[in-house]
């Protein structure tokens, strides 16, 4: 979040999408409702209750609504059709003598109303042309604009999880696929068990499909602590490769007190002495692969440093040069000379 990947995306010829302009339709890419009904049901379930308060009866009724909506309109189905099915079921003779069932139907109607066409977030989830296209080779999604609307952010992020997982499994295994989630604690903070289940499944099985997930956070505690969500622990536990970079000294000391067996004394000491990359021109990190550990330094050339930079002044410099008519390549080139002239000249 924060446009940190905008320059990289443009340099690589990727597609850059802002969260404010993202558009979804849960029914958009379905070809077989028998294979996809539960996936759509899970998406609507998380949207309706991000904290996972729907029970098996709620979900059974919601699955009926999803199937009925698809059978009536196929890819033209919308969340409105799901809500209309629930309303008709609530008013039907079938449940006239079942106040508990009718109560659950009414609860879902209220919870999903905000995502209908005329609801608060309807514009995001009822599009005839969803933003994510299957022909794009690189897509960067910037969700910073949704931070002040946590319910919408949860709905969008889980919709993305489902879309990405679907792309992982339904594209040729000869095609390499990579999903990178930066500031991943926002994703991993979900309390809904479904999110953890999806992440656990994805991290365990994507390698069979020549895919990989990379999840980045500022603090190891986001992944591995008593406060970490089930989604965070699933990501950590199912990752064969772990890269530990510079940590906050205070937070890392606290973590080692709580989990004294996670790192050996030498490892704790070395990690604690990692310097800031901007001061030493390289990043130090500990690489853990299964039971093996090794130490590394990452050096990046000045042009790449300029392209990857998310510092405020660097970002503004590139944007100003773009306004002056320079291409993204020319703007990054000038930034590299501005920041590292002698190194560029050598």
Stretch-by-stretch model annotation:
Residues 1-2, 6-211, 276-280, 289, ...:
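P-loop NTPase motor domains
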Residues 182, 201, 208-211, 216-225, ...:
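Conserved H-loop
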Residues 25-27, 224-225, 252-253:
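Short secondary-structure boundary/hinge segments and terminal tails
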Residues 2-3, 220-222, 249-250:
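Short acidic loop-to-helix transition motifs that present clustered carboxylates
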Residues 36-83, 227-346:
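P-loop NTPase motor core of the ASCE superfamily
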Residues 9-10, 192-193, 226-228, 256-257:
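Short amphipathic alpha-helical segments
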């Amino acid at each position: 979040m924060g446009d940190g990947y905008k320059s990289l995306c443009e340099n690589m010829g990727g597609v850059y999408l802002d969260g404010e302009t993202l558009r979804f339709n849960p029914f958009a890419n379905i070809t077989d409702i028998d294979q996809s009904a539960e996936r759509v049901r899970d998406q609507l379930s998380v949207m309706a209750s991000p904290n996972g308060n729907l029970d098996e009866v709620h979900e059974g009724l919601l699955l009926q609504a999803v199937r009925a909506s698809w059978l009536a309109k196929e890819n033209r189905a919308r969340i409105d059709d799901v809500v209309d099915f629930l309303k008709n079921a609530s008013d039907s003779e079938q449940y006239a003598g079942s106040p508990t069932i009718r109560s659950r139907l009414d609860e879902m109607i209220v919870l999903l109303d905000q995502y209908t066409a005329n609801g608060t977030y309807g514009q995001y989830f009822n599009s005839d042309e969803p933003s994510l296209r299957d022909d794009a080779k690189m897509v960067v999604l910037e969700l910073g604009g949704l931070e002040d609307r946590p319910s919408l952010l949860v709905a969008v992020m889980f919709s993305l999880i489902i879309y990405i997982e679907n792309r992982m499994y339904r594209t040729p295994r000869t095609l390499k696929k990579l999903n990178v989630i930066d500031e991943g604690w926002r994703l991993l903070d979900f309390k809904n068990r479904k999110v953890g289940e999806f992440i656990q499944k994805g991290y365990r099985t994507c390698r069979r499909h020549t895919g990989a997930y990379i999840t980045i956070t500022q603090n190891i505690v986001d992944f591995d602590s008593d406060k970490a969500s089930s989604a965070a622990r699933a990501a950590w536990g199912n990752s064969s490769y772990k890269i530990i970079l510079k940590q906050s000294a205070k937070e890392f000391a606290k973590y080692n007190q709580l989990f004294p067996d996670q790192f050996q004394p030498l490892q704790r000491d070395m990690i604690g002495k990692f310097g800031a990359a901007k001061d030493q021109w390289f990043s130090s990190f500990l690489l853990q692969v299964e039971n093996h550990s090794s130490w590394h330094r990452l050096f990046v050339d000045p042009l790449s440093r300029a392209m990857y930079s998310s510092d405020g002044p660097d970002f503004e410099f590139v944007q100003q040069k773009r306004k002056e008519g320079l291409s993204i390549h020319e703007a990054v080139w000038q930034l590299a000379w501005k920041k590292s002239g002698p190194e560029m000249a050598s």
